[in-house]
Regions:
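Glycine- and charge-enriched low-complexity intrinsically disordered segments
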Residues: 123-129
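A short, N-terminal "cap"/entry segment at the start of jelly-roll beta-barrel domains
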Residues: 1-48, 54-55, 83, 129
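Short acidic-glycine-tyrosine-enriched beta hairpin
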Residues: 77-96
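Short, conserved beta-strand element in jelly-roll/cupin
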Residues: 56-73
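Short, surface-exposed charged micro-motifs
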Residues: 25, 63, 90, 98
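Short, charged, solvent-exposed linker or helix-capping segments at domain edges/interfaces
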Residues: 47-48, 119-122
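Ligand-binding loop in jelly-roll beta-barrel domains
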Residues: 94-120
Length: 129
């Protein structure tokens, strides 16, 4: 069975998303993508839009744990309230969101692989523009 320390996961999804570099380390195990995010302040709104995600929102549900920092989540064009997950918290953010990292953050995520690949491919496209 596969196992790894978060900071030993392959950088940029083992080359699938080179622009992410060491800020997003991930590997696909079965139907899940295990990811470790280390980022400074980042608002993904424009990345989703420029990458061509439908409605400018992330289509991947995210399940995770925050080691430090925080993640703010908005749900555009819905009546869902914004959320803020902080250190020591586990989270689930359904598809249809925008992620905003208001401060340096380290988080471990377990995501459906296909859905995450669509999101990361879009972010890669946006970064290449």
């Amino acid at each position: 069975m596969p196992h790894a320390k978060p900071d030993e996961l392959p950088s940029g999804g083992a080359g699938r998303w080179p622009l992410a570099g060491d800020n997003f380390r991930s590997v696909q195990w079965g139907d899940m993508e295990v990811g470790y995010t280390t980022t400074g302040p980042l608002d993904c709104t424009e990345l989703y839009r420029l990458g061509g995600l439908p409605g400018g929102v992330c289509t991947c549900p995210h399940y995770g744990y925050i080691f430090e920092g925080s993640i703010r989540v908005t749900y555009p064009n819905t009546d869902w309230p914004d959320e803020l997950a902080g250190p020591g918290e586990v989270y689930f953010f359904p598809a249809g969101h925008v992620l905003i990292y208001p401060e340096p953050t380290r988080a471990l995520e377990l995501n459906p692989a296909f859905a995450l690949q669509q999101c990361m491919d879009a972010m890669q496209r946006a970064g290449q523009r």
